[in-house]
Amino acid sequence: LLNIKGKRSVDSIHKELGHIMWEHVGMGRTAEGLREGLEKMKALRKEFDTNLFVPGTAEGLNVELDKAIHLRDFILMGELVANDALSRNESCGGHFREEYQTEEGEAKRDDEHFFYVGCWEYQGNDDTAPVLLKENLEYEAIKVQTRNYKN
């Protein structure tokens, strides 16, 4: 990271990532917005890899280097969150896809296809798509039902 010698500060890239996440992967999500966000994050990752400037050295404490290391992880995590949201063709909990809502604007779940815990496995290469691992949910003590906020 210290050898890139670009022109962008860690903070400027971090701020841009936050804007992308807010605009495209925030509370109200759409497939189109998620795809656009993923493209922007991919471009931002390339910008990070080629145009980052981290002042200082690797000797001793270097706060900017520490922030850069974490920011690289944040970019990858943002991509994983967006990929997960794009793969879930439903609205459930904190995940609200605008395409999947009732006429009243309530979340529209699809338990038939998305009743599982998902974990995305990084493949060790940023250009290789992560693999979704699934573990089906099995409830014995409670009955699964749709939340109703009207009553």
Task: Go through each PLM region and give its residues.
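Glycine- and aromatic-enriched mobile tails/lids
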Residues: 1-151
